[in-house]
Amino acid sequence: MSNEEIIKAAAEAGTVGNWGLGNEYEIQALLTKYDEPTDYLSQDFTMDGFDDDSIKLASAMTYNELGLVKNDYDGGYDYGDTVGTIDMNDEGVAMLEDNIFCTKEFAEQNPNTVKAFLYASLKGWAYAVEHPEEAAEICYEYGSSVSAEHQAYMADEVAKLVTTDTKGETVSDYGYMDPDAMQQTLDLAKQYVELDDSAAAEKLQNFTLDDVRDTSFWEAVTASDGSDLGTPEKSEVSIQLKWLPDAQFMGYYVAQDKGYYDEVGLTVNIVSGGGDISETTAVNNGTVDFGVTWFTNLISADAGGMNLVEVSQIFQRSGLVLVYKLDNYTK
């Protein structure tokens, strides 16, 4: 069966799953593409619904849930090559995920700090994607919440998201803010993000990319050898991540472990977060200086009154897929 046939069959049976909480927009765009209603089953953060067939098309991140579905290590379901996937990039509905952001005020008041943090972080990402096995070990040693085997799987898959764009082309300029991919994300956000406040909804519809991103810091650090970044205005900074240490964020742990932050005059505190909402709030209210979130979450937060700006785009393509059992869709 083709992807279209599988999607239509699952949609009409009401067995397409997603977590919601801002993760659903690509799935809704995919369903719209095939003229199906945008309803989906609420999926928990295990793959048990996929396992017991209550969810026939289950949402999964390539670097996390898909690995658990396929592999037999601790926490895995051991489906191996008996599953298929539908990729949001291939379907033309990809939305960009992990970035680096801060407040506009922080960027204006601390430009050298932003450049130094970006320079060292991107150096960490460069090392991590070139040495994923070592990067996974570093993350594990920082207090991983998953097994060493899953960390290794995650590192390999995250490296693909950092080095490949939505069209499948290789990206060598880590942290690049691809205007086409960002515009597609913004356009889909305008179509599918629902905001209760009418003023916020109107603000969202009027956003341009320049309202939510600033490419100047990335451009400066990619042209630098590190010697011309200037003295950081703030030498001790913090970044809040979504979860406990794992390879989704390996670039920051590598930068910390290798001393890259020290080299640019920064002391960096990496804070384990509790999800995208707390992250945007923590950065906006000054609890932390930098955060990692999906681009759509930043857009929504700014529409709602926050004053955040993306300064680098780490993941160059969507990591979201729909996974299904081949046996369920074999003619």
Label every PLM stretch briefly.
Residues 182-236:
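Conserved C-terminal helix/tail region of periplasmic/extracytoplasmic solute-binding proteins
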Residues 37-40, 78-83, 145-160, 195-209:
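Short, surface-exposed acidic
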Residues 43-145, 289, 296-297, 326-327:
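Pocket-lining segment of extracytoplasmic ligand-binding domains
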Residues 9, 19, 30-34, 49, ...:
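Structured segments of extracytoplasmic/periplasmic soluble domains
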Residues 3-4, 24-28, 47, 63-66, ...:
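Extracytoplasmic/secreted envelope proteins and their assembly/folding machinery
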Residues 8, 12-13, 83-93, 165-179, ...:
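Short, solvent-exposed loop/beta-turn-alpha elements that line the ligand-binding surface or hinge
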Residues 1-42, 56-60, 86-87, 222, ...:
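Short, glycine-/small- and polar/acidic-enriched structural segments
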Residues 109-197:
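Secondary-structure end/capping motifs
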